[in-house]
Amino acid sequence: MMSSRTRKIYLFVFMFISTSLQLMNGEAKAEPETFRQFLYNKQKGTVLGRTGTSWCQITVFYIIFYIFLSAFFIGCLAIFLKTLDPKVPRFYGKGTIIGVNPGVGYQPWLKENPDSTLIKFNLQDSKSWEPYVKQLDGYFSRYNNTNDTRECGAEDSNEALQTDPDSLPCRFDLGLFEKANCGAKDQYGFKSGKPCVVVSLNRLIGWRPVDYDGNSVPEEIKSRYKSGSITINCEGATPFDKEHLGKVKYIPEAGIDGRYYPYVFLPSYQQPIAMVKFDTIPRNKLVIVECRAYASNIEHDVSTRIGMVYFELFVEDKKPVAAPAA
């Protein structure tokens, strides 16, 4: 069997003889092509190394190739989109980024100052509390559209929304807030110095409150707790705040009505809420308020503020300072 070294010797001899024969026959060695000739070679009729026919062939090839590639991509995308439900995330619940513990939010929250949790106004200056009233007007305006909703009695709920595509969500009644002087006609209590704050839960697909078992109801809500509801409890964040917060009224007293759950992604869905009225909030003192939502499946963590929300109340009662003359 021929070794590798022997093959290399034979190859060298063959190349040497071939080169010698070319020189003996007067054949000149081909000159290297210059860059200018590469761009355009007049003798060969090429541009960038290709003739016109070659350029046409490769252009047609890539057009057909990318058409098929695009069609394949669009087909795969269409098949993937068919597997998605526009109303429900593919993954939700425990172990997902959405999670199972709803967050707590509040209104009014001024969009002009989104990083601030301070609700501050002066009783003697209507311009200071009007922005909060307008914010709440805009927030409640979403409940004015009652199309594709239904009136629900005490025994009705949104339970069928997940299984029956023809079921309509329950219409949320704002009348209980008006009766408690926390409606638009009372400027949500801001004009009288008894501000009403909306407390709500974040929308979690499929989430519903779980009742406490027997004697497991927390002591702070035991007198107001009602089966099927998410009870809201607000108190001062520090001993100073607890001392000065004053009387707090909850509307409704049991908190957010659980029959409006579970939440589903429908344009006509009306989110259930509760309002907290601060009847005797002190004047000219800053009070930090902590509001918690209570149900058996709502956890609380002060460090991450899970299941709770914080905001500050500062109600002034003094003559506004006149702006200096220009």
UniProtKB/Swiss-Prot annotation:
Covalent S-S links between cysteines: C234-C291
Compartments, as annotated in UniProt: Cell membrane
Subunit structure and binding partners: The sodium/potassium-transporting ATPase is composed of a catalytic alpha subunit, an auxiliary non-catalytic beta subunit and an additional regulatory subunit.
Alphabetical list of PROSITE patterns matching this protein: ATPASE_NA_K_BETA_1
Organism, scientific name: Caenorhabditis briggsae
GN (gene name): nkb-3
GO cellular component: a single term: sodium:potassium-exchanging ATPase complex
Keywords: Cell membrane, Disulfide bond, Glycoprotein, Ion transport, Membrane, Potassium, Potassium transport, Signal-anchor, Sodium, Sodium transport, Sodium/potassium transport, Transmembrane, Transmembrane helix, Transport
Protein family according to the UniProt entry: Belongs to the X(+)/potassium ATPases subunit beta family.
Top-rank lineage group of the source organism: Eukaryota
UniProt-recorded Gene Ontology molecular function terms: ATPase activator activity
Parts of the chain that traverse the membrane: 60-80
Role this protein plays: This is the non-catalytic component of the active enzyme, which catalyzes the hydrolysis of ATP coupled with the exchange of Na(+) and K(+) ions across the plasma membrane. The beta subunit regulates, through assembly of alpha/beta heterodimers, the number of sodium pumps transported to the plasma membrane. Implicated in genomic response to various soil bacteria that affects fitness, lifespan and brood size.
Lumenal side: 81-326
Name of protein: Probable sodium/potassium-transporting ATPase subunit beta-3
Topological domains annotated Cytoplasmic: 1-59
